[in-house]
């Protein structure tokens, strides 16, 4: 800390100002304000961050000393003002806690009561928010013995005012000789660290990470130092290196990483104007700019900043894990040296952990850097890697060069890992954590810590990739196999499961580069297969899966699966059942590894439908596709059988069906046709809208809730319906719009509740939905087309211009309207309003929300049920939609939209 810094605090000038004023408050406030401005200015100028936070602590020391000296403390040897916690370390960020201990010599402190109260009142009046406790030395010992937080705070203390011997007595009373011996303290701190990490989902890669408390954050470094302090009396990284627990290179890496996080935290406090340790979307762009991350594309600048952030916290996490494991081996070691068991000439087991038999193993036999992970997969009883061996791995990973990568021993070992029955994901994670995977596969190293600035991808690319492999592995075990029965069944019968793991490893490896990441990844995958001398069939399948890993989900979400041509085109693209099986399993794992909230019953049913229909097409033969007329005949025949068995007059059925048109029978299966027909025929004339609600299935993973509406057609039907569903908190995922020749509309919506589940067998909820829709459709003129609702905080930070594409379908008499836009409440209702204004008829819709963006597809016609053929009309429609959506983006209190 500085001894003198007159720009920050001039003691003589301050005391002169105090002498001129009747009240000291104004002088204190002025000094605090000016010091804050000076320090913030220095931060923006790029001053060294450690100096800044120490300077702030030094300034607060001076202010507290001046405040303390305003009062008569009587016997000054019996009371001291002590800084504890982070302030005790001499580290203060703009809004850090200023934790104070007023330490007393004896319990009889009545003589100090008035001065203490007035001192604390003065601190409050001058705007210095402190956390304070008033304790005797004995009380400190009593509370520290019972509370881990108290002993931790007291270990980091400095005397600000009063006698230093008093603090030394407190330190003696709370030393390991009296409480919290190093072993007990270590166990408690290790448990505390694990619980804290679990609070943040045990990952460094949260979208809005906590700089202080999250895994790899500042608290991890502090935990290491607390344990070292209790064991060795060491309180800084440099001293820890002197105890041989840190190499000098590791000390430098930890120090630079800590400095980076300090700068981020300082900027957070400065921008938020309060104590804020969460790196919220609200601040990421401003901090990226403040720290010098610049790019023509602001989104890219944020991604660059966050990638450095994630790499820093990963480095901290790795090193702190290493040090804590080293502590564990030293502090918890028994008197004997532990049991050892040889594994081979290079490795042995030591108390269940694998270790190198000598320090030169990796230098003499570099292939052992891959062998160690294969051994752990082959021996699942191995608990992990000894700390010294982890350090050896880190020290020798520079030996992984092109010669190493092309050595057949190494390529064989890497492929062998993927053929192990268990431990693939666990050991790939270890390889990534120790920096081996990114060295062996440089293309993988590029995606480490790479985050995409959106709400759709909640993990970095490397974490998502390893999560995908984890999900593939879990498909073989209950209860995951029960949740994903088809994927689990297919996974169990894949001829070579190692190929899907390798495809998963490469599927997103092209992210972050210019160009289509699927194409880039396919090129990398081809090179990988060649280098590892995989058979031609294996290589072709891996490359094809990487190139096409998005095709199945895109088809299921954006195409009309009721159209036989869509199924036939997809079957032609896939080519055979083996590829279909691999692609389906990879798609399910990819979605669940991207964002667990993306997987819902409706998405599951779409993929399963596409898989089943494609499999039928492949077995039927691609040269014999099912045509529309054949599908309609099959549906009508099966539905009529159901109705006749239930006693329905076939003549009545034929009369009704004659009004419906071909599209209706293409878009619905026989069971739904029978269900609709029976209800319509029983509906009394002029009884108002018919609203039917049923589950698509009884099993949770099988689909959503189907709402069928039959009513006289009216121009604002779609707009009113979607607005009503918004008010009922329903999320629309699919819409099928049919208008009969008798001008009745037969609309089917697949919906889920806000939590992503189907409505279930809740009679009250079903009645609420039926009554709400019936009332809205009976009196549409009284129903608001748009319902006001605020935009969620996170969505506000992801803004981009809406994209609207209009094109005619060469194979069907419809126009396809594709909309990509920021997710905002009221989007569907706004689109419905545009359709009303342009006299547009909606035939079908596919609704999808991917994080903060919507990707909706509408199949539309003009009022005569013909595709839109006027280019000027299409241009005006496109412009109107964009203007309407931009108006929705500009509004803080935006209307409600059905989200996905």
From Swiss-Prot:
It catalyses: [protein-PII]-L-tyrosine + UTP = [protein-PII]-uridylyl-L-tyrosine + diphosphate; [protein-PII]-uridylyl-L-tyrosine + H2O = [protein-PII]-L-tyrosine + UMP + H(+). HAMAP family: PII_uridylyl_transf (MF_00277). InterPro entries: ACT-like_dom_sf (IPR045865), ACT_dom (IPR002912), HD/PDEase_dom (IPR003607), HD_domain (IPR006674), NT_sf (IPR043519), PII_UdlTrfase/GS_AdlTrfase (IPR013546), Polymerase_NTP_transf_dom (IPR002934), UTase/UR (IPR010043). Its EC number is 2.7.7.59, 3.1.4.-. It comes from the Bacteria. Signal peptide: none annotated. Residues 343-705 are annotated as: Uridylyl-removing. GO terms for molecular function: [protein-PII] uridylyltransferase activity; phosphoric diester hydrolase activity. Uridylyltransferase (UTase) activity is inhibited by glutamine, while glutamine activates uridylyl-removing (UR) activity. Residues 1-342 are annotated as: Uridylyltransferase. Residues 706-784, 816-900 form the ACT domain. Belongs to the GlnD family. Keywords: Hydrolase, Magnesium, Multifunctional enzyme, Nucleotidyltransferase, Repeat, Transferase. Modifies, by uridylylation and deuridylylation, the PII regulatory proteins (GlnB and homologs), in response to the nitrogen status of the cell that GlnD senses through the glutamine level. Under low glutamine levels, catalyzes the conversion of the PII proteins and UTP to PII-UMP and PPi, while under higher glutamine levels, GlnD hydrolyzes PII-UMP to PII and UMP (deuridylylation). Thus, controls uridylylation state and activity of the PII proteins, and plays an important role in the regulation of nitrogen assimilation and metabolism. One of its GO terms (biological process) is regulation of nitrogen utilization. NCBIfam families: PRK00275.1 (NF001366), UTase_glnD (TIGR01693). Its cofactor is Mg(2+). Has four distinct domains: an N-terminal nucleotidyltransferase (NT) domain responsible for UTase activity, a central HD domain that encodes UR activity, and two C-terminal ACT domains that seem to have a role in glutamine sensing. It comes from Pseudomonas entomophila (strain L48). This is Bifunctional uridylyltransferase/uridylyl-removing enzyme. Residues 461-583 form the HD domain.
């Amino acid at each position: 800390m500085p001894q003198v810094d007159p720009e920050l605090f001039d003691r003589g000038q301050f005391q002169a100002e105090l002498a001129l004023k009747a009240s000291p408050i104004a002088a204190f406030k002025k000094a605090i304000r000016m010091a804050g401005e000076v320090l913030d200015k220095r931060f923006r100028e790029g001053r060294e961050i450690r100096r800044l936070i120490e300077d702030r602590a030094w300034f607060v020391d001076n202010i507290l000393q001046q405040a303390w000296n305003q009062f008569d403390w009587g016997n000054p040897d019996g009371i001291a003002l002590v800084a504890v916690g982070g302030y005790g370390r001499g580290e203060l960020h703009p809004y850090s806690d200023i934790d104070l201990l007023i330490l007393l010599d004896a319990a009889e402190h009545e003589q100090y009561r008035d001065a203490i109260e007035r001192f604390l009142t003065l601190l409050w009046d001058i705007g210095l928010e402190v956390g304070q406790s008033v304790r005797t030395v004995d009380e400190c010992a009593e509370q520290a013995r019972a509370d881990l937080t108290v002993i931790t705070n007291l270990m980091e203390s400095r005397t600000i005012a009063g006698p230093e011997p008093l603090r030394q007595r407190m330190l003696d009373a709370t030393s390991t000789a009296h409480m919290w011996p190093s072993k007990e303290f270590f166990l408690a701190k290790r448990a505390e660290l694990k619980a804290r990490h679990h609070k943040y989902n045990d990952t460094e890669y949260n979208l809005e990470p906590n700089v202080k408390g999250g895994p790899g954050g500042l608290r991890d470094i502090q935990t290491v130092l607390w344990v070292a302090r209790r064991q060795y009396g060491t309180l800084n990284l440099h001293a820890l290196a002197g105890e041989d627990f840190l190499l000098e290179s590791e000390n430098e890496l930890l120090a630079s990483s800590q400095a980076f996080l300090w700068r981020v935290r300082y900027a957070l406090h400065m921008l938020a104007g309060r104590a804020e340790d969460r790196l919220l979307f609200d601040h990421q762009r401003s901090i990226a700019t403040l720290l010098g991350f610049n790019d023509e594309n602001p989104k890219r600048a944020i991604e660059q900043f966050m990638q450095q952030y994630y790499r820093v916290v990963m480095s901290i996490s790795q090193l702190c894990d290493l040090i804590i494991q080293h502590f564990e081996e030293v502090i918890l070691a028994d008197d004997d040296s532990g049991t050892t068991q040889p594994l081979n000439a290079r490795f042995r087991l030591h108390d269940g952990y694998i270790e190198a038999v000598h320090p030169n193993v990796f230098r003499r036999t570099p292939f052992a850097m891959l062998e160690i992970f294969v051994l752990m997969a082959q021996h699942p009883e191995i608990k992990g890697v000894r700390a010294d061996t982890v350090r050896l791995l880190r020290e020798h990973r520079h030996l992984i060069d092109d010669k190493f990568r092309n050595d057949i021993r190494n390529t064989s070992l890497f492929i062998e890992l993927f053929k192990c029955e268990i431990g693939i994901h666990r050991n790939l994670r270890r390889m990534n954590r120790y920096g081996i995977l990114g060295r062996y596969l440089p293309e993988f190293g590029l995606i480490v810590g790479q985050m995409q600035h959106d709400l759709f991808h909640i993990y970095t690319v490397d974490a998502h990739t390893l999560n995908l492999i984890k999900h593939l592995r879990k498909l073989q075990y209950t209860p995951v196999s029960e949740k994903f029965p088809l994927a689990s069944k297919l996974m169990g019968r894949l001829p070579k499961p190692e190929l899907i793991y390798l495809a998963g490893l490469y599927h997103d490896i092209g992210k972050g580069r210019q160009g289509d990441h699927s194409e880039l990844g396919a090129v990398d995958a081809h090179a990988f297969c060649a280098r590892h001398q995989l058979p031609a069939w294996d290589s072709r399948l891996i490359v094809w899966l990487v190139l096409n890993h998005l095709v199945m989900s895109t088809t299921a979400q954006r195409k009309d699966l009721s159209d036989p041509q869509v199924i036939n085109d997809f079957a032609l693209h896939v080519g055979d059942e083996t590829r279909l099986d691999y692609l389906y399993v990879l798609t399910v794992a990819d979605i669940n590894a991207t964002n667990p909230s993306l997987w819902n019953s409706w998405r599951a049913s779409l993929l399963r439908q596409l898989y089943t229909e494609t499999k039928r097409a492949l077995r039927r033969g691609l040269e014999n596709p099912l045509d529309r007329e054949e599908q309609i005949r099959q549906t009508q025949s099966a539905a009529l059988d159901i109705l006749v068995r239930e006693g329905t007059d076939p003549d009545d059925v034929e009369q009704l069906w004659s009004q419906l048109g071909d599209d209706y029978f293409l878009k619905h299966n026989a069971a739904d046709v029978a269900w609709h027909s029976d209800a319509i025929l029983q509906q009394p004339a002029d009884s108002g809208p018919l609203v039917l609600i049923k589950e698509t299935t009884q099993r949770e993973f099988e689909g959503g809730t189907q709402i069928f509406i039959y009513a006289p057609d009216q121009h604002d039907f779609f707009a009113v319906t979607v607005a009503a569903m918004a008010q009922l908190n329903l999320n629309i995922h699919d819409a099928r719009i049919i208008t009969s020749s008798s001008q009745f509309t037969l609309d089917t919506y697949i919906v889920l509740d806000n939590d992503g589940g189907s409505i279930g067998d809740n009679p009250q909820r079903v009645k609420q939905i039926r009554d709400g829709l019936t009332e809205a459709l009976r009196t549409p003129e009284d129903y608001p087309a748009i319902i006001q609702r605020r935009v969620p905080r996170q969505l506000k930070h992801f803004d981009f211009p809406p994209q609207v594409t209009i094109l005619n379908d060469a194979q069907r008499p419809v126009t396809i309207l594709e909309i990509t836009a920021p997710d905002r409440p009221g989007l569907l209702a706004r689109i419905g309003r545009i359709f009303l204004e342009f006299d547009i008829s909606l035939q079908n819709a596919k609704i999808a929300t991917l994080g903060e963006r919507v990707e909706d597809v509408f199949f539309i016609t003009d009022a005569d049920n013909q595709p839109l053929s006027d280019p000027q009309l299409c241009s005006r429609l496109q412009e109107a939609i964009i203007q309407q959506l931009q108006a929705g983006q500009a509004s803080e209190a935006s209307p409600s939209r059905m989200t996905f």
